[in-house]
A protein has these predicted regions:
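Core dinuclear metal-dependent hydrolase active-site scaffold
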Residues: 35, 174, 187-192, 197-229
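Active-site HxH/HxHxD metal-binding segment of metal-dependent hydrolases
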Residues: 87-194, 203, 297
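Bacterial N-terminal signal peptides that target proteins for export
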Residues: 2-14
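Divalent-metal (often Zn2+) His-rich catalytic cores of metallo-beta-lactamase-fold enzymes
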Residues: 234, 254-316
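C-terminal regulatory/interaction regions
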Residues: 305-359
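Bacterial N-terminal signal peptides
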Residues: 13-24
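Active-site neighborhood of phospho(di)ester-bond hydrolases with catalytic His/Asp-centered motifs
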Residues: 69-71, 94-102, 122-125, 216, ...
Length: 359
């Protein structure tokens, strides 16, 4: 979810740290296991604390083999998951699917490969391309984040030059302290990319479990993979769906709208998001779709009046897009969620405008 090389991340470090520390965003203190069906489990990882967010992991145990969706961020967490899987079954993990290239979903690949040497790691072709570019540099990017946080403490100002409040300073200092164990671990990480890529939907039979691997369209990234279990009516969505606040800091929101529509049309009673608790209907998926569509429709209306985006700036259009009507449904009255929502929607408008500029 937290895209460590996104230009927007460094600009939003203070709010990101505040949110990652917020109990109202991620209340679980340890990984939480939910059984979704017979021999199908979701592991919802701690998403805050040390600032290294880990996506959800889904485990599908067949009569012959095990299929894992997303290997999470820190290898130590992946090893804990592997130990849990071995409590459930003595069958080997034969497949790990990385839903997309953000490293909170795939930096644990090496831990799985070490534990199961015959493992096949699957990703969409576009995902592997991005993994190979960005995966090996994880430690360096996190060092830059630490340096940015330290600079804020030293200067007493955020990256926009605004003075830090006493609360902000405490949050940043605590974040640096929490991040140290993860930074130490990243020094020894060996990046493991996908070993098998796909461009078209395919099915794997694990033995009494049919696993369909799908590409429903671009959204969060260029290669978002979705896993569908038709017998159990379960969809594993990756970061196409993130709760409680969508992760829309880059990606392809104009296409994401249709991708979410495609996802909602799968016959599913359970949806596993990339981050957050399991869902049992498509209500939240459609809410995210509607948010993006509202932003795009308002932007298009402004462009129809003002002219093509290539001749405008974001400042020319952002005041014409009002997404406050969605705020209550995403954030309620929680101040941290409201701050996250406002940052997300500002970036949604920015990315939509950038897409429009290329038309």
């Amino acid at each position: 979810m937290y895209h460590p090389f996104s230009k927007s991340r460094l600009r939003l470090t203070i709010i990101a740290i505040a949110l990652m520390a917020s109990a109202s965003l991620y209340a679980q203190a340890v990984s939480k296991v939910t059984q979704l069906a017979a021999n199908v489990y979701e592991i919802q990882h701690l998403n805050a604390g040390d600032g290294f967010a880990s996506g959800n992991t889904t485990v599908i145990i067949g009569d012959r083999q095990v299929f894992v969706v997303d290997s999470c961020f820190l290898p130590s967490t992946a090893r804990q998951d592997i130990a849990q899987i071995r409590q459930w079954t003595d069958k080997p993990v034969a497949f790990v699917l990385n839903t997309h290239f953000h490293n909170d979903h795939n930096l644990g690949n090496r831990a799985y490969m070490d534990a199961f040497p015959a493992l096949t790691i699957i990703a969409h072709t576009e995902t592997k391309k991005d993994m190979d570019i960005f995966g090996p540099g994880s430690e360096g990017r996190e060092k830059k984040t630490n340096a940015s946080l330290q600079q804020m403490l030293d200067s007493g100002k955020d990256q926009d030059g605004k003075p830090l409040s006493a609360e902000d300073r405490e949050q940043v200092k605590a974040a640096l302290d929490r991040r140290k164990p993860g930074m130490d671990e990243l020094k020894a990480v060996k990046f493991q990319s996908a070993t098998l890529t796909f461009d078209h939907d395919f099915t794997i039979d694990l033995g009494n479990h049919e696993v369909q691997v799908k590409f429903l369209g671009r959204g969060n990234t260029a290669g978002d993979a979705v896993v569908y279990l038709p017998k159990e009516k379960i969809v594993v969505a990756g970061d196409l769906v993130v709760y409680p606040i969508p992760y829309i800091y880059d990606g392809y929101p104009a296409e994401w709208i249709q991708t979410l529509q495609n996802l909602s049309q799968l016959d599913a009673g359970t949806i596993v998001p990339g981050h957050g608790p399991v869902m049992h209907d498509e209500t939240y998926v459609l809410l995210v779709r509607d948010l993006m569509k509202s932003a795009m429709d308002q932007l298009n209306a402004k462009l129809a009046q003002a002219g093509p985006a290539m001749f405008l700036t974001i400042d020319d259009v952002k005041g014409s897009i009002d997404l406050t009507s969605f705020q209550q449904r995403f954030a309620g009255n929680d101040k941290d969620l409201i701050a996250a929502y406002n940052n997300m929607t500002a970036n949604l408008v920015k990315v939509l405008f950038e897409e429009a500029s290329l038309r």
